[in-house]
From Swiss-Prot:
GO terms for cellular component: plasma membrane. It comes from Escherichia coli O6:H1 (strain CFT073 / ATCC 700928 / UPEC). Forms a complex with MdtI. It comes from the Bacteria. The keyword Aminoacyl-tRNA synthetase does not apply. It is found in: Cell inner membrane. SUPFAM superfamilies: Multidrug resistance efflux transporter EmrE. It holds the Pfam family Multi_Drug_Res. It is a multi-pass membrane protein. Gene3D superfamilies: 1.10.3730.20. Catalyzes the excretion of spermidine. Belongs to the drug/metabolite transporter (DMT) superfamily. Small multidrug resistance (SMR) (TC 2.A.7.1) family. MdtJ subfamily. Residues 23-31, 76-81 are periplasmic. The gene is mdtJ. This is Spermidine export protein MdtJ.
Length: 121
């Protein structure tokens, strides 16, 4: 089961890298940023598609998008001098609270009980 969480972590990391490279490509010369963006976003979806085999889709998607938005915002402030207003901080705090609620409200699926088949004689 841990491998699926690792895959989800890789999906998040590649999404963050891909999205940040999109911004980098828009402010720099050349096509390197766009190529990196294409590769990273593609990998992100591939990793996510494997992760949802064992992780609930709602949880996986909330973590993928939510953690991605959180880190993309923080890295945008650090790397691209974007502003971080009080409203953005409130939004990020609400986002984290929502992720925690979604994760904590998810139950593990029960294993199906074995059916005893009493064939007619």
């Amino acid at each position: 089961m841990y491998i699926y969480w690792i895959l989800l972590g890789l999906a998040v990391a590649t999404e963050i890298t891909g999205t940040l490279s999109m911004k980098w490509a828009s402010v720099s010369e050349g096509n390197g940023g766009f190529i990196l963006m294409l590769v990273m976003i593609s990998l992100s979806y591939i990793f996510l598609s494997f992760a949802v085999k064992k992780i609930a889709l709602g949880v996986a998607y909330a973590l993928w998008e939510g953690i991605g938005i959180l880190f993309i915002t923080l890295f945008s402030v650090l790397l691209f001098d974007e502003s971080l207003s009080l409203m953005k901080i409130a939004g990020l705090t609400t986002l984290v609270a929502g992720i925690v609620l979604i994760k904590s409200g998810t139950r593990k699926a029960r294993k199906p009980e074995l059916e005893v088949n009493h064939g007619a004689v």
